[in-house]
Amino acid sequence: MPRQIPLEKVRNIGIMAHIDAGKTTTTERILYYTGRVHRLGEVHDGAATMDWMEQEKERGITITSAATTCFWQPRYGLLKDVRHRVNIIDTPGHVDFTVEVERSLRVLDGAVAVFCAVGGVEPQSETVWRQANKYKVPRIGYVNKMDRVGADFFNVVEMIKERLKANPVPIQIPIGQGEMFAGFIDLIRMKGIIYDKEDGTTYQEVEIPHDLENQAKTWRVNMLEAVSDIDDSLLEKYLNGEEITEEEVRRTLRVATLKTEIIPVLCGSSFKNKGVQFMLDAVVEYLPSPIDVGAVTGHSPRDEDEKIARQPDDSAPFAGLAFKITSDPYVGKLTFFRVYSGVLKSGSYVLNSITGKKERIGRLLQMHANHREDLDEVFAGDIAAAVGLKDTKTGDTLCDESKSIVLEKMVFPEPVIQIAIEPKTKADSDKLGMSLAKLAEEDPTFKVSMNEDTNQTLIAGMGELHLEIIVDRLKREFKVDANVGKPQVSYKETIRKKVEAEGKFVRQSGGKGQFGLVNIIVEPSEKDKGFEFVNEIKGGSIPKEYIPAVSQGIQEAMRNGIVAGYPMIDVKVTLFDGKYHEVDSSEMAFKIAGSIGFKEGARKAGAVLLEPIMAVEVITPEEYMGDVMGDLSGRRGHIEGMHQRAGAQVIKAKVPLSAMFGYSTELRSMTQGRANYSMEFHDYSEVPASIANEIVEKSSGKVTA
């Protein structure tokens, strides 16, 4: 079946924001107005379509980014009445699920940033914004919850400018705020939109109310100045006092949004059904199609320096990126992927250029939150799910075997918190390992390991909520009952100096012996670079078939560092010389030699202990400022700044995670429940010597590592 919708009429977008800004409700309304859902789902009664995991329905938060497809014809503007296809990914706002946001932003072309009209720019908004900046994702802003008491559209616009360092340009301003919110003024057409009923499908176009005429003129001038700054010919017209047409405004707004120079800002109340259709018009009008985004670049699987580009074109060779794996009770493993170029047919074979394996596409599915529709083929720009890919992981490239390419991989943060987990019964014991492996396959920030000293299974993740949800899923989806220990900090180790080391493994005791000798340089790598292995063997002092074994031995040794047995990170090892024996050398011998050499090098290189540091933001009434700051300092916190927000004081600090367990209870009692806080992982930093000694002592008899 040929392509149904031309590529320039496709929009791949994400709905992004902090927790409670109304993302899921906004997505629900989009699905309702585009005809994909016949009944409105409300988050607060647990019926939202996009929140389809049991835990999401109970907690009213979105955990996994569900992908869905819908169609929209704008009512106004240059694309009036032209049918567009909109693929939407609903992303979670809770900081423990940042990886889901990161994953979805990687495969999107544009995004709607939803802000709460009362709370404005919250800490998580800043995190998500930084992630979107990293991938240069064009955005429009949507100030939601305009019907709430305390709603202030203009304050939110100011916060977007100040805190996100963006260039917000309102293209609408509200008519009334809070309970008086009735609609908005369209600054491009200079018309008022007043909603009649609660269902939002009925509204009247009116002249601008008298009392808002001056305000509307002021903000229209602001918009015209912003677009004139982008286009010299418009600037000339503007300075000469000539009329700038509606078409020119819309066209320039689109160009500026695509370059991320402007963020068009709209307003509404998704819950009260006001403003969503006009936001959809803006999605189609200002956010990019895959053609606007242009070619995706990657490199040859054989040579990282050989760059390859793939145009968003059905006639180009197939290239796609797997961005999410989920387990489905009916079809098994589902691999969500974005098609960047070419066409993929159901039943065909693709090459996974990361593993080098060919895989067969059993079925292709178009997902609508949690129900699905079978497809015969998918085209450039599509987001779909495949059944049948056994060895594909998140971030892998799928491509045409004859024209292979490796797209940029996704980098995921290291887990910061871990707990010991043990099955309650023998039956649970049999299922636990398999169930955890499935969950780890779905979520790259969830890690499972074994403490060899105590024989305990350890699970690690991005926060307490993250691990709570995992344990909950074990019980519900996999029917595994487990006991969990207290949360433990995931410490890491690294080195501070550059040293040379030798690793020698010799075993000669009759018959075939074992021999391997390696000379390596061990040094710190750049922060967040992970492990780097450089092979500089010249002249065959170690045969090339043994080199991967050396790297493997080093990586295995890094799993248990030498300070307190914690994993080592940010280390670079260069293999520059060695010796082998014609008869006695083997892969195993060189693997052990690599491990011995690395351990010796790490000892000489001044190995140190690292701990996760959290960026903490506390919002408190002024009278508790002193107590809160004193308490944070007592937790080894470093206060970085304070400012006012909506009548409260905001304190920003960097605090070790180990000092933050149980903080919410302490904060409640200190402020009589009037303060709240949020925190997210910032980085790993060296543990002070006195505390490091305590940790080492504990770990020498440790129960959980």
From Swiss-Prot:
SMART domains the record matches: EFG_C, EFG_IV
Pfam families: EFG_C, EFG_III, EFG_IV, GTP_EFTU, GTP_EFTU_D2
One of the record's GO cellular component terms: cytoplasm
CDD domains to which the protein is assigned, alphabetical: EF-G (cd01886), EFG_III (cd16262), EFG_mtEFG1_IV (cd01434), EFG_mtEFG_C (cd03713), EFG_mtEFG_II (cd04088)
InterPro entries xrefs: EFG_II, EFG_III, EFG_III/V, EFG_IV, EFG_V, EFG_V-like, EFTu-like_2, G_TR_CS
Function of the molecule: Catalyzes the GTP-dependent ribosomal translocation step during translation elongation. During this step, the ribosome changes from the pre-translocational (PRE) to the post-translocational (POST) state as the newly formed A-site-bound peptidyl-tRNA and P-site-bound deacylated tRNA move to the P and E sites, respectively. Catalyzes the coordinated movement of the two tRNA molecules, the mRNA and conformational changes in the ribosome.
Protein name: Elongation factor G
High-level lineage: Bacteria, Pseudomonadati, Chlorobiota, Chlorobiia, Chlorobiales
Gene name tied to this protein: fusA
